[in-house]
């Protein structure tokens, strides 16, 4: 079991001009070691912004992966229940305070801790607010 944490101040699909995947996105997928990994996008920090979600689905859909979106502003329970299926959890930019508060309320922090301790490679990625959520202090 290996856990990779890849964090950046910005970049990836959300910064590409046409919404296409970047080398960073391909690298994150490659780290999973799976042929068709499940990639979960967590747009919580942006209040589950619909255009951000569409951009993710377009970019990652072209990479031959399976995709899911962790939505906590609507249908949170079902979304959190599916989270352990993810090989890669990619957390988007926005408000770190909102992100952490909603994760605690809905138990996402506990689910992620369990995922990290499992006998399976897990990749955790994030941009901006999504980068800072992986650290304490």
Region locations from a protein language model:
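N-terminal beta1-alpha1 cap of cysteine-dependent amidohydrolase-like domains
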Residues: 1-92
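Class I SAM-dependent methyltransferase SAM-binding "motif I" and its flanking Rossmann-like core
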Residues: 98-137
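Phosphate-centric recognition/catalysis
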Residues: 95
């Amino acid at each position: 079991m290996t856990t990779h944490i890849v964090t950046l101040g910005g970049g990836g699909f959300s910064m590409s001009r046409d919404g296409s995947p970047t080398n960073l996105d391909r690298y994150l997928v490659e780290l999973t070691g799976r042929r068709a990994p499940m990639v979960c996008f967590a747009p919580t920090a942006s209040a589950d912004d619909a255009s951000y979600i569409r951009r993710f689905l377009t970019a990652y859909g072209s990479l031959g992966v399976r995709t899911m979106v962790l939505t906590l502003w609507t249908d949170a329970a079902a979304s959190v229940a599916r989270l352990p299926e993810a090989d890669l959890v990619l957390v988007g930019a926005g408000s770190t305070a909102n992100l952490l508060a909603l994760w605690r309320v809905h138990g996402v922090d506990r689910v992620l801790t369990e995922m990290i301790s499992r006998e399976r490679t897990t990749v955790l990625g994030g941009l901006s607010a999504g980068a800072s959520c992986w650290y304490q202090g």
